[in-house]
Amino acid sequence: MKYEIVAFYKQEIEEIRECAENIGRLYGWRYRCEKIPGSGKLLSACMGEDSVLCLLKRKSYSFYRLMKYVYALNKPVLVLQDHFSADTFQQLKIPVGYLKENKEKGIWANFLQRHHPGCLIEIIVPREKDEHIAAMVRNNLAFMERILKHSEARYEVVNEEKSFEKSLIKVLQDLSPGITLMMRPFRLFPFYYPYTVRLYRKHARSEVLIIPRDDSLYIPCH
């Protein structure tokens, strides 16, 4: 199967075409540029069966509109900064949180590295004071390592002396080439921004892949 990237632009296709072309060449995927619709509800109509990744330029939208699109799309969204380059894809950064959906970061990092074996996955492990939360982090880390070892992926584990939130801030502020993988947190209301989204808004200086939770991976408990 040949996957597809859908790159959205606001006014002119030149805003995003070069980025989409470079990423498509790197991964061996097709790309398609679409003018972003006025309503977030119309975004799903732009997605095809093979669409695996969406691109948005950070500076093209207000933060409110950017999040409106990110939450309307049911695919991972790579938000690009102005200084994007091919070197960006040489490193995938995974800050490990305690929520179970953090495991999906490992799945996506593994998927991306399979299509671009030259990149390195950096797993950033926080130090949590609460033992229950620390155990949940260790569980997520063990899952990620199991997947990556099975795939013989290149990765390294970096232990931080900070909590998940402080580790995330540090990674978001890092200007060195790399993509930070971040889960899209659940929100109750369109005008409400969960804490990690507020951290992204305040601190992000580099590329971030925002991943929606895949509910098909979870079994509801009754």
Sequence positions of predicted segments:
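Short acidic/Ser/Thr-enriched loop-to-helix initiation segments
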Residues: 1-27, 65-73, 84-124, 139-147, ...
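Short beta-strand elements in bilobed, periplasmic/extracellular small-molecule ligand-binding domains
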Residues: 25-35, 120-124, 150-158
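A short, well-structured beta->alpha microelement
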Residues: 31-46, 160-168
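Conserved beta-strand termini and adjacent loop/short-helix elements that scaffold enzyme active sites
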Residues: 34-36, 80, 124-126, 158-162, ...
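Gly/Ser-rich helix-loop-strand patches that form or flank binding pockets
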Residues: 41-85, 172-222
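A short, flexible beta-alpha/helix-coil linker loop
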Residues: 126-130, 186-187
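GTPase G-domain guanine-specificity segment
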Residues: 129-143
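Glycine/small-residue-rich hydrophobic helix-like segments
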Residues: 141-186
